[in-house]
Amino acid sequence: MKQRTLSIIKPDALKKKVVGKIIDRFESNGLEVVAMKRLHLSVKDAENFYAIHRERPFFKDLIEFMVSGPVVVMVLEGKDAVAKNRELMGATDPKLAQKGTIRADFAESIDANAVHGSDSLENAHNEIAFFFAAREF
């Protein structure tokens, strides 16, 4: 089924200048970039986006990391896009990620793990709406 999902290339990957390599992974695996923007998240935006994690012990560090530099936010479209994106990203902890996944190849740690991807179709809809207006597609 053709779906859309959200992907965020995080500050650590921008600092390493691997944005193009990550986008190539998506495109060469059947995911089309249908919307994209580069921005610097405010603390408020990061807190609102990651509100589901507000009570978790890592929340403060996550917010500090996500506002530490610019990010690239994208909408990816393709067959089973949510699952495909998660497969391409690999495990949250790059040490556990399979060789050839984005996190295994480009991430430093469980915190600086290069990319974010929606974990469900419902969350994909909400996350896309957080960053993009319908007219941007």
Curated annotation (Swiss-Prot):
Keyword Ligase: no
Family membership noted in the UniProt record: Belongs to the NDK family.
CDD domains hit by this protein: NDPk_I
Disulfide pairings: none
GO biological process, one term: GTP biosynthetic process
Pfam families listed in its UniProt record: NDK
EC number annotated for this UniProt entry: 2.7.4.6
Name of the featured protein: Nucleoside diphosphate kinase
GO cellular component, one term: cytoplasm
Record bears the keyword Metal-binding: yes
Enzyme type, top EC level: transferase
Summary of the function given for this chain in its UniProt record: Major role in the synthesis of nucleoside triphosphates other than ATP. The ATP gamma phosphate is transferred to the NDP beta phosphate via a ping-pong mechanism, using a phosphorylated active-site intermediate.
Species this chain originates from: Helicobacter pylori (strain J99 / ATCC 700824)
Binding site residues for ATP: 10, 58, 86, 92, 103, 113
Subcellular location as annotated: Cytoplasm
Subunit structure: Homotetramer.
HAMAP family: NDP_kinase
Active site: 116 (pros-phosphohistidine intermediate)
Superkingdom in the source lineage: Bacteria
InterPro entries named in the record: NDK-like_dom (IPR034907), NDK-like_dom_sf (IPR036850), Nucleoside_diP_kinase (IPR001564), Nucleoside_diP_kinase_AS (IPR023005)
Main location per the UniProt record: cytoplasm
Keywords per UniProt: ATP-binding, Cytoplasm, Kinase, Magnesium, Metal-binding, Nucleotide metabolism, Nucleotide-binding, Phosphoprotein, Transferase
Catalytic activity line of the entry: a 2'-deoxyribonucleoside 5'-diphosphate + ATP = a 2'-deoxyribonucleoside 5'-triphosphate + ADP; a ribonucleoside 5'-diphosphate + ATP = a ribonucleoside 5'-triphosphate + ADP
Matches recorded under SMART domains: NDK
Cofactor: Mg(2+)
